[in-house]
């Protein structure tokens, strides 16, 4: 059995990258466990670019971005049940806090688990708020911003275009967040980023640097304001962009979506026992392909006197080749083997005195690719404002220019399936959560969401921060659906929809456990304060549930992992994922409680350090008990 201390820091990104390199190139490891880059160059040979001048994107502050990425977070996420809806059932999360810190905290439990990311970051129009990160102590920086600690002269302001580092500030804000977000995407995951012309060029270069140019999937143009902005300088801008990248290179058609009912009705006019279908010509209608370069797709198909189709010659049948009207020798779209195996789908029709071969294309599962210009009225900003106003029952602009729900639903249809997870770490008014809930209610896609929003002040009395608006909007979406469902099928009977019909609120905060501050003054008072941690290392006013969720998250489990409370001989313990992990956050533990936990044979157990009260014998007996029960790892915190 392994024994150790639970790390209270977020994942060490740099260390993970080093381990990945050493796994691929073990011959580059030095005696001290470092990487010999000269050896790495020799291993890679001609693949290494040793020139001084290289094409790439650089800007003032880029080096600090890497320091931000590599500096671990010791923060935690506190559960806020009173602001949640069906906390224990829902798999949706709304997290209030600085998204950089939150993204770091999500690295352990959500790496490679997010299928889709959508963000609508500040457009950098000259009046946008750009959150000033601090690579030395970003959590303290966040607490100062939210007024949780004092800081004389701390200045948070908009990113004015008169500032000489106007573009650099925007890049410095976005780069580390995108870098961390990429780690959360699964291999076939997709990220969509809204922007306008102010930073489009920089955003594409930034995405090439973080995700790789080969994973670019395209740039969508969204008609968001048909009238155009009359205050613009030269042209009345009426569009925005969505830049789309994959976590890896995706196959053709990976983002196709199901055709709408009206489109099916219009396009699929034939019907048989297999359902609605349309006829598509089997001959390749692109003239650049033909017998000259696709000889395997040139073969005869036979049509008998009653129009029956076969790939084999029958008495009296006519031989049909994929010829163009001018005699050009084209080719079929199917190979001979496929035509033989699926000959029941082939249909012959006489056109202008000549036989042509068609194939049946059924409407069931029919897909279409999104056009690169999204011009439907459901995507307009005005539509987003109507959706928002309908929920809040007011025409007052509580939130400026919320994204259209229809736009987000369409993007989700390209990427999500039942059980998938979508992340939005610039959540704003909560359109992403709204769209995900709507798709679930319509029984089209049952996906979960994580929304992250900074508690940016609004200056209002009712909704004091943007994150308050985020939570209230999603709350109202759920309430609206429940009212509409009254008298219909009980949501409890719909299983997953009930489970998705809620959200858990978490709030960014300093760790529940007082940790050594590496940035403290080295004076006597500073050292004395740090020494106090050895006496009482748990923050005051923190609950058992607060402690549990920090341990859960830092043990590499998602915040929505299956959890069961149970009684262990008079004390409460938490079982995670059917005893894969058992956590006990009681301040005092007994031998009987240890025995009760050991009987469940968990894979891993975690206790508080102080639970053993300095009783080395009790702790030693606990270790022996757990080892006998087959526990693989025993940790304390």
What are these regions (language model features)?
Residues 99-102, 109, 173-178, 184-187, ...:
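Phosphate/ATP-binding catalytic cores across multiple sugar-kinase/actin-like superfamilies
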Residues 438-637:
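PRPP-dependent phosphoribosyltransferase catalytic core
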Residues 248-390, 394:
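Active-site-adjacent helix-turn-beta-strand microarchitecture at beta-sheet edges
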Residues 174, 187-188, 197-263:
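Signature of N6-adenine DNA methyltransferases within the class I
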Residues 59, 133-140, 171, 198-203, ...:
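Conserved S-adenosyl-L-methionine
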Residues 113-190, 198, 214, 239, ...:
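SAM-dependent methyltransferase catalytic-core segment centered on the flexible catalytic loop
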């Amino acid at each position: 059995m392994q024994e150790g201390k639970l790390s209270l820091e977020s994942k060490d990104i740099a260390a993970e990258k080093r381990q990945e390199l050493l796994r691929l190139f073990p011959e580059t490891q030095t005696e001290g466990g470092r990487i010999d880059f000269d050896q790495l160059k020799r291993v890679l040979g001609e693949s290494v670019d040793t020139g001084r001048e290289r094409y790439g994107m650089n800007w003032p502050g880029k080096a600090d971005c890497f320091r931000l990425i590599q500096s671990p977070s010791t923060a935690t996420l506190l559960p806020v049940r009173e602001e949640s809806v069906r906390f224990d059932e829902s798999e949706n999360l709304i997290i209030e806090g600085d998204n950089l810190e939150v993204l770091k905290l999500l690295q352990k439990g959500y790496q490679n688990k997010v299928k889709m990311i959508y963000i609508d970051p500040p457009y950098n129009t000259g009046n946008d708020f750009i959150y000033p990160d601090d690579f030395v102590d970003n959590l303290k920086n966040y607490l100062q911003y939210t007024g949780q600690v004092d800081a004389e002269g701390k200045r948070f302001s908009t990113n004015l275009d008169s500032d000489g580092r106007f573009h650099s500030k925007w890049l410095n804000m976005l780069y580390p967040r995108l870098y961390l977000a990429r780690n959360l995407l699964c291999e076939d995951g997709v990220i969509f980023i809204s922007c306008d012309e102010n930073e489009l060029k920089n955003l594409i270069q930034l995405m090439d640097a973080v995700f790789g140019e080969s994973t670019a999937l395209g740039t969508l143009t969204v008609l968001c304001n048909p009238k155009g902005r009359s205050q613009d300088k030269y042209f009345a801008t009426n569009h925005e962009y969505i830049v789309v990248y994959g976590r890896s290179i995706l196959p053709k058609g990976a983002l196709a979506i199901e055709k709408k009912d009206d489109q099916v009705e219009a396009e699929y006019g034939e019907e048989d026992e297999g359902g609605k279908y349309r006829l598509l010509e089997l001959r390749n209608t692109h003239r650049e392909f033909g017998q000259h370069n696709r000889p395997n797709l040139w073969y005869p198909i036979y049509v008998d006197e009653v129009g029956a189709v076969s790939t084999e010659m029958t008495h009296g049948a006519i031989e049909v080749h994929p010829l163009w009207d001018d005699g050009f020798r084209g080719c079929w779209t199917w190979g001979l083997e496929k035509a033989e195996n699926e000959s029941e789908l082939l249909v012959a029709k006489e056109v202008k005195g000549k036989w042509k071969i068609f194939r049946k294309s059924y409407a069931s599962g029919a897909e279409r690719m999104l056009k690169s210009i999204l011009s439907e009225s459901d995507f307009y900003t005005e539509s987003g404002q109507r959706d928002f106003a309908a929920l809040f029952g007011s025409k007052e602009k509580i939130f400026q220019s919320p994204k259209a729900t229809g736009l987000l639903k369409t993007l989700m249809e390209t990427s999500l399936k039942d059980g998938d997870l979508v992340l939005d770490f610039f959540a704003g008014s909560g359109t992403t959560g709204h769209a995900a809930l709507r798709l679930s209610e319509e029984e089209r896609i049952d996906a979960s969401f994580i929304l992250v929003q900074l508690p940016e002040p609004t200056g209002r009395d009712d909704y004091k921060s943007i994150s308050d608006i985020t939570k209230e909007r999603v709350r109202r979406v759920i309430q609206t659906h429940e009212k509409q469902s009254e008298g219909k099928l009980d949501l409890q009977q719909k299983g997953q929809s009930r489970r998705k019909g809620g959200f858990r609120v978490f709030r960014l905060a300093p760790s529940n456990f007082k940790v050594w501050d590496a940035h403290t003054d080295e004076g006597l008072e500073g050292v004395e304060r740090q020494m106090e941690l050895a006496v009482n290392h748990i923050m005051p006013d923190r609950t058992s549930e607060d402690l549990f969720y920090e341990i859960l998250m830092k043990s590499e489990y998602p915040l929505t992992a299956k959890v069961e409370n149970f009684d262990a001989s008079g004390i409460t313990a938490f079982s995670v994922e059917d005893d894969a992990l058992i956590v006990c956050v009681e301040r005092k533990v007994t031998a009987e409680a240890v025995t009760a936990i050991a009987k469940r044979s968990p894979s891993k157990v975690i206790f508080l350090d102080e639970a053993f009260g300095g009783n080395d014998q009790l702790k030693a007996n606990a270790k022996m008990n757990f080892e006998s029960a087959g526990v693989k790892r025993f940790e304390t915190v």
